[in-house]
Amino acid sequence: MPLPVALQTRLAKRGILKHLEPEPEEEIIAEDYDDDPVDYEATRIEGLPPSWYKVFDPSCGLPYYWNVETDLVSWLSPHDPNFVVSKSAKKLRNSNADAEDKSERNLEKVDRNHEKSDRSHEKPDRSHEKADRNHEKSDRERERNYDKVDRERDRDRERERAFDKADREDGKDRRHHRREELAPYPKNKKATSRKDEELDPMDPSSYSDAPRGTWSTGLPKRNEAKTGADTTAAGPLFQQRPYPSPGAVLRANAEASRSKQQD
């Protein structure tokens, strides 16, 4: 691995490095190596193994040893018997941060699992609540059915009472009509009773279903043929037939008496 150009220049000025590698032809941007924490001279003087360098830590002001291949560090020289290597503080912080992030993610995962388990436990609770609501709903429906049956029963009772009342009123009306029929003079028909009193007892309408006649009933009408039939008679026995003559009646009676004598 070639050394940096600035380091080769320093070593050449001090006489440590006699052969300078030619600079590359490509353009190189100037860099400031004054702040380089690697102490190359101390590294050369102490004779550190390959890939080990002595580095100055500006934060604490103390040197440490750094392996550029494994990226491990140590506060003691590799030649020291108490030499112990470890990761740098920066890497430890990063690893700790990664571990903390990982632990936080694990904790979040555990929390999510707990929440999921809680929700799974809540599901049976919700199912129980649903069952309770269904029971309450069935109870309410049963109560409504009972109330409906009670209302129907009350309506039936009211209907029966109405029927009984109507029957009592009908019986009362029948008894009232019977008393009126049995009474000699009805009191509820004054106008008709007056007409009935004026009715002639010999009028057929007073003792039969014949209609009541007027003053002109039975008088000969104009342009009416004189057939001798009784136009005032009604019913199936008469049918408006003319009366027989008196001689025909006498002859019929004589024939009837002869037939009786012969018998």
From Swiss-Prot:
SMART domains: WW
GO molecular function: double-stranded DNA binding; GTPase binding; ribonucleoprotein complex binding
Biological processes, Gene Ontology terms: activation of innate immune response; alternative mRNA splicing, via spliceosome; cellular response to exogenous dsRNA; defense response to virus; innate immune response; neuron projection development; positive regulation of defense response to virus by host; positive regulation of non-motile cilium assembly
Stretch list, region Disordered: 94-263
GO cellular component: centrosome; ciliary base; cytoplasm; cytoplasmic stress granule; neuronal ribonucleoprotein granule; nuclear body; nuclear speck; nucleus
Sequence repeat ranges per the UniProt record: 104-110, 111-117, 118-124, 125-131, 132-138, 139-140, 141-142, 143-144, 150-151, 152-153, 154-155, 156-157, 158-159, 160-161
Biased composition (Basic and acidic residues): 99-173
Location of region: 5 X 7 AA approximate tandem repeats of D-R-[NS]-H-E-K-S: 104-138
Keywords: Immunity, Innate immunity, mRNA processing, mRNA splicing, Nucleus, Phosphoprotein, Repeat, Transcription, Transcription regulation
Domain spans labelled WW: 46-80
Region 3 X 2 AA tandem repeats of [DE]-R, residue ranges: 139-144
Keyword Transcription regulation attached: yes
InterPro entries reported for this sequence: WW_dom, WW_dom_sf
Domain remark from Swiss-Prot or TrEMBL: The WW domain may play a role as a transcriptional activator directly or via association with the transcription machinery. The WW domain mediates interaction with WBP11, ATN1, SF3B1 and the C-terminal domain of the RNA polymerase II large subunit. Except for the WW domain, the protein is intrinsically disordered.
Family matches, as PANTHER family: POLYGLUTAMINE BINDING PROTEIN 1/MARVEL MEMBRANE-ASSOCIATING DOMAIN CONTAINING 3, POLYGLUTAMINE-BINDING PROTEIN 1
The protein's name in its UniProt record: Polyglutamine-binding protein 1
Organism: Rattus norvegicus
Organism classification: Eukaryota, Metazoa, Chordata, Craniata, Vertebrata
